[in-house]
Amino acid sequence: MAEQHSTPEQAAAGKSHGGLGGSYKVIVYEMENFQGKRCELTAECPNLTESLLEKVGSIQVESGPWLAFERRAFRGEQYVLEKGDYPRWDAWSNSHHSDSLLSLRPLHIDGPDHKLHLFENPAFGGRKMEIVDDDVPSLWAHGFQDRVASVRAINGTWVGYEFPGYRGRQYVFERGEYRHWNEWDANQPQLQSVRRIRDQKWHKRGVFLSS
């Protein structure tokens, strides 16, 4: 994806590509615990530090969900941000100590239903596991190995994790086909837990909370 040059103010006004108006809103703070300079966004922002903010210390998602990235232009490690408060870096990242968060976009949820197919080999080969309207904290517990080399997201939006219990690097699967693990920006074909990303529009009881 080519880097775009829009400021947080432009994103907040919905001028950048992908603006979704009032249905998505996030407040980004420069310091931990919602202190310091702040920036409100209602659309994608490929470079959070281009204008007002020197860094990102905490986040409040008022409506979403959103997908944040470690680097500019929607690159690097991914972080799913559902409705709620994230007072410091370890509230959105559980894989390593990285307080770098430089780009952000709304995460489209195409409906209340969820279906996901996981495959052992690239190009949808080998063993297959189907998950329907459920969260799976351990693929091993369901008789599947940790090697996942291709994925079909039939319905809904999902997030996969490197380790059991929704730990490690996060990989988002929006509706579509992923023939090889490099298509979800992974370095190896390893997934050990997956869950649904839900929108309060259909799921009024709220969103996922990590233990």
Curated annotation (Swiss-Prot):
One of its GO terms (molecular function) is structural constituent of eye lens. The modification N-acetylmethionine is found at residue 1. Residues 24-63, 64-108, 114-155, 156-198 form the Beta/gamma crystallin 'Greek key' domain. GO terms for biological process: lens development in camera-type eye; visual perception. Residues 200-211 are annotated as: C-terminal arm. The modification N-acetylalanine is found at residue 2. Residues 2-23 are annotated as: N-terminal arm. Crystallins are the dominant structural components of the vertebrate eye lens. Has a two-domain beta-structure, folded into four very similar Greek key motifs. Belongs to the beta/gamma-crystallin family. This is Beta-crystallin B3. The lineage of its organism: Eukaryota, Metazoa, Chordata, Craniata, Vertebrata.
